[in-house]
Every structure is written in C-alpha cells, then in structure tokens.
C-alpha cells in the first residue's frame, strides 16, 4: 500500500526511531510500512493518522481499487 508517512515524518523532522517510539513499534516496522513491504493493522493505521492529524485516506492509498 502506498503511503505518505516518510514525507509527513520528514516535515516534522522525526526519525523512523522516534515515530516507532510514538507508535510503540520497532523502527524496522516503520521502515517496512514506509517502503510498502508491510501494511499496518487498522488500529496502527488509525494511530499513525492521529499522530499526523490527518484522515487515514490522506496518508494511505491502496495500490489498486477493490473489485
């Protein structure tokens, strides 16, 4: 799933480690989400959206439309 986490994180000057601490996940998890290798759970996606004060759909974009 495409997302804008890396860009949003950079705008705030946050490292992957800092974001990981705020979300209570590993830095590797943040990296995997940013690079699209891992899709976050719904609760984690909501936590990310809350931290960045944006709706989920403004951060996450599915690779393809559902059928």
Predicted regions span which residues?
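Short basic helix-loop element that most often maps to the first helix and adjoining turn
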Residues: 3-22
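Key DNA-contact positions within bacterial/archaeal DNA-binding proteins
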Residues: 17, 28, 57
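Recognition helix of helix-turn-helix/homeodomain-like DNA-binding domains
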Residues: 25-38
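DNA major-groove recognition helix of helix-turn-helix/homeodomain DNA-binding modules
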Residues: 43-58
